[in-house]
């Protein structure tokens, strides 16, 4: 059923450049939501803390990993997170400690408690390593998959879905 925009669950995935981890998360989580038939309940997007990759498409490692898994790539151009995003989104989900630190600085120290680290939803304090440096998109995918599943379970427990 189509929800009104105000009641939709608005999720923004964040990483440093918005070409590797956050775009992978956006596509993986979108696929999970679509598979569950919940696409009308969510607004899902991604953004960067940095300006380095603005306007660039997802990294070829992200594109290739999704293709290998048969998960549709959500088309995206890298953009930097804004204060408007803070007002718009309910969950602003970073990948590592540096993302969280930068988000807190950029988004007025998170007065509404919207900033989370993805693997915290899977009961872990671990960072998701940046495959731009590691080259290991398999490990990144496993972490993103685990965090996304944990986030869905969190939303179920909260009675949101």
Task: For each feature predicted by the language model, list its residue ranges.
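Hydrophobic structural packing positions in well-ordered secondary structure
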Residues: 15, 66, 93-94, 144
């Amino acid at each position: 059923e189509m929800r009104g925009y105000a009641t939709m669950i608005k999720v923004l995935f964040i990483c440093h450049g918005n070409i590797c981890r956050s775009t992978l998360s956006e596509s993986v989580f979108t696929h999970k939501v679509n598979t569950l038939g919940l696409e009308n309940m969510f607004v899902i997007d991604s953004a960067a803390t940095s300006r380095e990759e603005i306007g660039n498409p997802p990294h070829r490692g992200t594109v290739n990993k999704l293709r290998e898994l048969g998960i549709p790539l959500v088309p995206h151009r890298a953009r930097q997170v804004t204060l408007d995003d803070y007002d718009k989104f309910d969950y602003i989900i970073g990948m590592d400690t540096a993302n969280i630190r930068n988000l807190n600085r950029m988004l007025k120290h998170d007065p509404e408690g919207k900033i989370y680290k993805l693997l915290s939803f899977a009961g872990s304090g671990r960072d998701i390593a940046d495959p731009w440096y590691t080259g290991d998109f398999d490990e990144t995918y496993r972490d993103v998959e685990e965090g996304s599943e944990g986030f869905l379970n969190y939303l179920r427990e909260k009675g949101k879905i």
